[in-house]
Amino acid sequence: MAAVPRLRPIDHEERLTLVDHLGELRTRILVAVGAFMLASSVAWWQNHEVLEIVYRPLPDNIPEPITFGVTEPFTTTLSNSAYFGLLASLPVILYQFYAFVLPAFSPKERKVATPLIAMIPFLFIGGVAFCYFVVLEPATDFLLSFNNDEFNTQIRARDYTSFVLLTMAAMGIGFQVPVAILAAVRLGITTPEKLRKNRRYAILVIAVLAAFLPTIDPITLILEMVPLILLFELSIVLSAALQGREAKAAAREAEAVEAAEREKAPDSPS
């Protein structure tokens, strides 16, 4: 009888053969791919609603995007379904990756990694939502109305959906700033004091990264920078608070050990 595939995290002390590791990897890849295919199938089934969501940021005076050629309606709908499927299945994919690499972490590293991994899908969805509800509408309005007296503007569906979904994905990735900073602080790579001291360079890096997003106008650039800077500042506050709590816990533990040693020590002769 074939062995039951593993779907649980392996303990740090557990030792597996190469074949066992490959079987574990295969199972988790199948689960991740299955989740992606299921979510993409649902998005394909509800493709009309998906396209309505994508088209909503367009200004009212702009007609619906157009397609060219016989196959483009099919391929555009297929790519939209894949993008939405990836977004919906991301928590499952991240968990499968985390569960596979978890045995390589020591117990101390696992205490750092577990809460940070749990933050990733929520921050990603937060970035996507911020982009959709705050950034996309002013961005499309500005870009489509710019010098519009000189152009007969028509939007190609494939280009527009790629623009929207790429911008949303980029903002979702950009919202991972707290994960990167907290991980660096917890692993001793940097400190809150160094982050505060080099704040100006961090803001410059954020501005450069935001400039590479598909929305190239200055107004949208500011809209994209503001939450990233706030997340950077929040990360400094959180990392400082965590460091302070850990320092207090270490001090209490040292005091408890010292008190226990005093109790065990024999009484001095009178």
Residue ranges, per PLM feature:
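Membrane topogenic/interface segments and analogous intrinsically disordered interaction regions
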Residues: 1-270
